[in-house]
Amino acid sequence: MVKAKWRSVDGIVLLNKPIGLSSNQALQRVRRLYQAAKAGHTGALDPLATGMLPLCLGEATKFSQYLLDADKRYLTCIQLGKRTTTGDREGEVLTEDSVPTLTDESLEEILNGFRGEIEQIPPMYSALKHEGKPLYEYARQGIVIERKRRRVTISNLTLVSRTEDTLTLDIQCSKGTYIRTIGEDIGEALGCGAHLHSLHRISTAGYLPENMMTLEEFEAIAEQGYDALDAHLITMDTAVEHFAKVELPESDTVNMMFGRTVPSPVSLEHEAVVRMYDQGTQRFLGLGQIKGAFIRPYRLVNTSEFSL
């Protein structure tokens, strides 16, 4: 397939990230397949992790923050009895302890302490920044930085299965939750230590897992040309479906796309954000913000260029 240098292509790709690649490496692989002029991911997955990584192409990058802020769901296997330097299986083993015998009731009591709103201390091996540098860079130098506790919400935590020394959990959580820290903290609650053996992101922002594809699948489709690839793009407005929908008549659409405030066809609370569409074509225009009886431009797409 002969490829142009870069092209204007807009939409969201649901990638099933393979193990061993950083999120940025995976993004660049997909970006090159699409030859997309602009691209960005929506929240990093560690190289050890697999699963859903929504990638925003073109104008969709304007809405990537909403996917970054969205709830996420994971399937994780926690190895009990061993603490590691990194909190996952790639680190050096620091301690080994015997795993206590647990009844279903005693285990459930411990797991219940990790449901709802909880506090976490972010791990040193994380991309969280301190004075402009990610924490993992300090950790690799043996430097420990004091981190503040963070409140996160675990909306669901289900025990899927267990063995004598592993727990497999299905976890749905808010933005900023470190599953690795949950694994380590469960190990401490059990008194034996633990680390993350595997991590798979099932979904982000309610996107269905059956809609994501592997790199190999995208590479095979790329052999058929851009039209085949573009058929697997998800429209960018799905990133902001949680906002109320507003349809504008043609005259207001034109004014809005020129950056002008227009009358609001709906009554919503002041400063509410809405997703806007042209009434006739149902074309997504971007986001607006309610100002009294009007809507002002908030985050608009470039209608002269976008393809979805």
Curated annotation (Swiss-Prot):
Taxonomy, superkingdom: Bacteria
Protein name (database record): tRNA pseudouridine synthase B
Catalytic reactions on record: uridine(55) in tRNA = pseudouridine(55) in tRNA
CDD domains: PseudoU_synth_EcTruB (cd02573), PUA_TruB_bacterial (cd21152)
Family according to the record: Belongs to the pseudouridine synthase TruB family. Type 1 subfamily.
Disulfide bridges in this chain: none
Alphabetical GO biological process terms: mRNA pseudouridine synthesis; tRNA pseudouridine synthesis
Described purpose of this protein according to its UniProt entry: Responsible for synthesis of pseudouridine from uracil-55 in the psi GC loop of transfer RNAs.
Gene: truB
Pfam families, per the entry: TruB-C_2, TruB_C_2, TruB_N
Organism from which the protein derives: Marinomonas sp. (strain MWYL1)
Keyword Transport applies: no
Active site positions: D46 (nucleophile)
Record key words, sorted: Isomerase, tRNA processing
Taxonomic path: Bacteria, Pseudomonadati, Pseudomonadota, Gammaproteobacteria, Oceanospirillales
PANTHER family found in the cross-reference section: PSEUDOURIDYLATE SYNTHASE TRUB1, TRNA-PSEUDOURIDINE SYNTHASE
